[in-house]
A protein has these predicted regions:
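Active-site neighborhood of HAD-like aspartate-dependent phosphohydrolases
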Residues: 3-75, 91-94
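Alpha-helix termini
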Residues: 23, 59-64, 103-105, 252-254, ...
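Structural recognition of alpha->loop->beta junctions
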Residues: 84-85, 281-297, 363-387
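Acidic, Mg2+-coordinating phosphoryl-transfer loop and its flanking beta/alpha structural elements
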Residues: 274, 328-376
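Conserved Rossmann-like nucleotide-cofactor binding loop
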Residues: 39, 46, 269, 334, ...
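Conserved phosphoryl-transfer catalytic core
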Residues: 51-190
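Substrate-recognition "cap/lid" segment bordering the active-site pocket of phosphatases
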Residues: 7, 228-250, 260-262, 266-327, ...
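Substrate-recognition element of Asp-dependent hydrolases with the DxDx(T/V) motif
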Residues: 51, 131-137, 141-199, 207, ...
Length: 395
């Protein structure tokens, strides 16, 4: 698709693009569903830092060697998300940690295998990490030189290029394939995967460390009912800011003629509500789908339903009742893929990609254009103006 096939509009925040062959359907929109992170809320100083800090913390404890918090850069995080399989930031931490440990010298992996077996799997995640940290103190000091770190970053970027929209599963499959000639690696991989246990807060190393650093002590205890053990101060969530302006949500409600605004997000409900505050009341309560809702459905249906699976989008749309057409607004390739899959099931879905609050704005704009997204906006705040330009009027 060439740029000539788009209607281009200029706004203060940047350029907007509308596919000309979608305009008639956009005019019929009577429901709008939003992703949360990067769309309603600016997360650039929260989630991305939580990923790099969590990975560095876990790796330091599990190897006995300090890892710089800035080693896993915004570029690396962007590459993970660009695969379409890492909307869940816990999965990004998993990918970083598993790959890094797979690159460790064989002697370190051998020690680590023994330490994990000694630590077992019954104690709390932080207790298990500290046990392994203490195990390293019993042996010769572990050393990793600057060359290891520089090669690690390069090799990690190359590894991410072979990952796909299956996310964590593609991490496991590709690591096992890369090390298929190593007789000990499969046992190491299985043991490590069980040790990290990437799902449940209070049992999972990754989830527990991440949420403590992200939420901070007070919010972590309030949400999960677990006493914090590694972060006794404020969390990175305090760095978040609202992108969406209340007046623009009001404009959309007026244009639609009813409160047909929903959320389909991989965020945790309580952390999203913490930042959205009273704005959450502007959304249809029947059309709010967060990570906990998807996880509950996965347990019930016994199959993976996280993005880019269209479950959360279609579930949120159900809350609107009968609609002619809906717009889903996201900021990642995973969102675009999810909307495309939802459109395969129902032709009513239009995708709008927003790029202003992504890590690399120009790169995300280029990707959205290459993917032939229906609408491309700098931010969600331009949408009311676009709908009005196309003939929609406030009620």
């Amino acid at each position: 698709m060439t740029l000539k096939e788009y209607l281009k509009l200029n706004f203060e925040n940047g350029e907007a693009y509308i596919r000309r062959d979608r305009i008639s359907q956009i005019k019929e929109v009577d429901g709008i569903i939003f992703d949360c992170d990067g769309v309603l809320i600016d997360i650039r100083e929260s989630y991305n830092k939580a990923i790099s800090k969590s990975a560095a913390y876990i790796l330091e404890k599990i190897t006995g060697f300090p890892f710089p918090e800035d080693l896993f850069s915004n570029e690396i995080i962007h590459l993970f998300r660009a695969t379409g399989g890492f909307n869940d930031d816990w999965d990004t931490v998993y990918g970083i940690v598993m790959f890094t440990l797979s690159k460790m010298p064989s002697e370190i992996r051998k020690h680590l295998t023994t330490f994990i077996e000694e630590a077992g799997f019954k104690n709390s995640p932080i207790s298990r990490l500290r046990f392994i940290e203490n195990c390293w103190k019993r042996i010769e000091a572990n050393t990793l030189d600057a060359r290891f770190f520089s090669e690690l970053v390069k090799d990690l970027k190359d590894f991410i290029k072979i990952l796909d929209s299956t996310g964590r599963r593609s991490v496991d499959e590709n690591l096992l394939k890369i090390h298929e000639q190593d007789a000990d690696f499969q046992h190491f991989h299985t043991l490590l995967k069980r040790f990290l246990n990437s799902k449940e807060i209070g049992r999972s190393v990754i989830a527990t460390v991440f949420e403590e650093l992200f939420c901070g002590a007070r919010l972590f205890k309030e949400i999960y009912g677990i006493n914090p053990r590694i972060n006794m101060g404020p969390g990175l969530i305090e760095n978040e800011r609202l992108i969406v302006k209340p007046k623009h949500l009001d404009s959309l409600i007026s244009i639609l003629g009813r409160k047909n605004l929903g959320i389909a997000s991989g965020s945790r409900r309580r952390s999203a509500e913490y930042i959205l505050g009273e704005l959450i009341k502007k959304f249809n309560p029947k059309s709010l789908v967060f990570a906990e809702d998807v996880e509950a459905a996965e347990r019930l249906l016994k199959k993976p339903l996280k993005k880019p699976h269209p479950y959360s989008l279609l579930k949120a749309a159900e809350g609107f009742g009968k609609v002619r057409s809906i717009i889903y607004i996201g900021d990642s390739m995973e969102d675009a893929i999810m909307a495309s899959r939802a459109r395969d099931e129902t032709r009513r879905v239009i995708f709008a990609g927003v790029y202003r609050y992504t890590i690399f704005e120009e790169e995300m704009l280029r990707i959205f254009l290459k993917y032939r997204c229906d609408i491309i906006l700098p931010t969600v705040n331009e949408l009311p103006s676009i709908l009005e330009m196309l003939g929609r009027r406030k009620n």
